[in-house]
Amino acid sequence: MADPTPTPALPIRPGALQSIVEFILELDKLKGVSRKTRPLGLERYENSAEHSWQIALLAASLVHHAPKSADGESAIDLDRVIHMLLVHDIGEIDTGDTMVYVVGGWEERKAAEREAAERIFGLLPEPQGGHFLALWLEFEEGASPEARFANAVDRALMARPLAEIPLGWYPREIRFDDGQVLKGPN
């Protein structure tokens, strides 16, 4: 399935490369956003950049199990899914990680994350910045089969820390059997 909105080709304009460099330098801050889970076998918490990389590879590994089209091919555009997963947590640069099990305050957190995504993608020249923001919004809204698949992949890793209790979410007292695992806005 062809991507209906491919990444736009950009002419090299004065300042465009500088804008892209500023964007990439801003993205480096994602490495400093600590999440609430720890990598297997490590005492430290993972960061959002590591998370995005891991779920992009998980999506590539799982795409063969996604729904098929009439011709037997995957109905999911993997490139689009990977692009969504690489940008889905960009707003956390400004807002920090929000644990999906937090009850209440979702509207405020989502608004702050959107404002952050608009700021960060706004560092890029158009139409590229708008393209990345559109992918981010598509993921947030679950507005396509690709976005729903990407959201499922993102949430699939949430069960992993339960396999390593007490290192996982134990300090936050979250257990599989208390109904917390499925909480969140989506």
Regions found by a protein language model. Give the residues of each.
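Alpha-helical, largely C-terminal catalytic domains
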Residues: 1-186
